[in-house]
Amino acid sequence: MVLVIRPKGGIGNRLRVVTSYYLKYIKNKDEKLIVIWRWDKFCNGYFQEYFEPIPNVEFRTHNDPTLKINYSGCSRVGPVDFSIIKPLPHIMNKINEKRNLLNNDYIAIHARRTDHISPAEKRGVFTTDEDFFKFIDENINNSSLYVATDNADTYTIFQERYKDKMKFPYHKDTGSYRKTSLEDAIIDIYMCGYAKKFKHSGWSTFSGLINNLRKNLL
C-alpha cells in the first residue's frame, strides 16, 4: 500500500501529521508513505533540506497527478513521536555549538506571538510576558536563558530584562510572513528541547512539538 499525504501549516503542524501517519500506518509495516511537502508562507523550506530520511517515507515537493492524495491538512490521526525526526548533521552541529556556548546550562521559553495572539486569547490560553517572567525568575538561578520567539520586539523585551543571561542576538528577519527561517525555527526547537527547564506557549503546536521531544531528549 502507498499512502499519500499533504501536511499543511507551519513546521509543528506538518511534523505532527507526518509522525502520526508514520506511526499508525508505516512503522514496522511493509507500506510506503509519500509526503507532498510544499514550500509556502507558513513553512519556508523543504523537509529533506533539514532532516534525515525516514524509513519507507518519500518526501516530494510536488504531487504526481496520477497519485491520489489520501489526506491534506494539519490534523493528526493518532499519537505523535517527534523523536523519529532527526536533523541533518550540519544542523545538529549548529545546535550543539549553541548548547556548548551556554555550557549546556540554560532554561528556555517559547513565546509565540504574531498571528497566534488572538486565537490563544479567545481560548483563554494565551501565555503572557508576565507568565514567562515569573517562570524565568523562579528558575534561572545561575543558568543562561534561551528565548525562542517569532517576533523581534518580543525578543528585545526579554533581552532588555535579562541582558546578562541571553547570549545570542535575534534571528535575522526574513522580511516575509514567516519572520524566521526554517533552519532558525528548527534550531529553536532543539535548543528548547535540550533545556534544563522549559516554558511553552499555550495553543501552539510548535510548543507541543518541543514538549514531545523533551520526553525523549532528557
What residue ranges belong to the model's regions?
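N-terminal pre-catalytic "stem/leader" segment of glycosyltransferase-like enzymes
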Residues: 1-37
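Secretory-pathway luminal glycosyltransferase catalytic domains
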Residues: 4, 38-142
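Conserved aromatic-histidine-acidic binding/catalytic patches
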Residues: 5-13, 124, 146, 179, ...
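Active-site catalytic pocket residues across diverse enzymes, especially alpha/beta-hydrolases
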Residues: 25-28, 162, 214
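Short catalytic/ligand-binding loop motif for oxyanion handling, primarily in non-cytosolic enzymes
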Residues: 13, 41-46, 116-119, 153-157, ...
